[in-house]
Amino acid sequence: TTFRALTDNDRGAGHAFERAQWAVAGKYARCVDTKVEPLGETAVSVTYTYELAIAQRTKVTIRYVADVLGHVDLHVAYPGEKDGDLPTIPAFGIEWMLPVEYSNLRFYGVGPEETYADRKHAKLGIWDTNAFRDRAPYLLPQETGNHEDVRWAEITDDSGHGLRVSQTANTETGVTKPFAMSLLPYSSTMLEEALHQDELPEPKHMFLRVLAAQMGVGGDDSWMSPVHEQYQLPADQPLNLDVALDLF
């Protein structure tokens, strides 16, 4: 995904017009190459190359390294696009649809409330929440529920079974970075398309977003001021998401 549901601040600052192309860039990206490599006798690497639906056709790679025990390392890379004057990116990462029963979230990051690049007012710790509690019922549905500086997160059903997502090292730099994430009963697209809360349907799935980064939410005012420059994501700079996935 390269998009987030617009906030009231985004609309007031004109971000909808400026960043409209990012709403479709990831949603309609097309796979242009697949590469499968055995890694010895116990693991395999599968790399998908996607072409973003923008004029520059920037290529993003998604690499899965899976072993026979079910452990998966996921590496998602955006190289930065210096051709053309692209607007800054709202968000970059992966959004998955999960069965509706996987609504519980435990994470090690800053919380327990939602946090953003320019709203890190919370404490670092291990927090328990759920997809329904994390969704703020704004009059106009919008971006909500993000958690920053996450080291690991566990998404579970009421029986305690689920998925663990944890930070891992980048294969090229060796650097390990925290990630941003959210678990909500609605996708970014569903939140963006609804004009009122009662237009959101009864939840049938959960939506897990795991992001390399997301721009800030601003708030100097809600009718003109943009997100401060240091909390935006320049399109000409690379972005990398590196996480490990384990079922339990």
Question: Which role fits each region the language model picked out?
Answer:
Residues 1-248:
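Beta-strand/loop-rich accessory regions of lumenal/periplasmic or secreted enzymes
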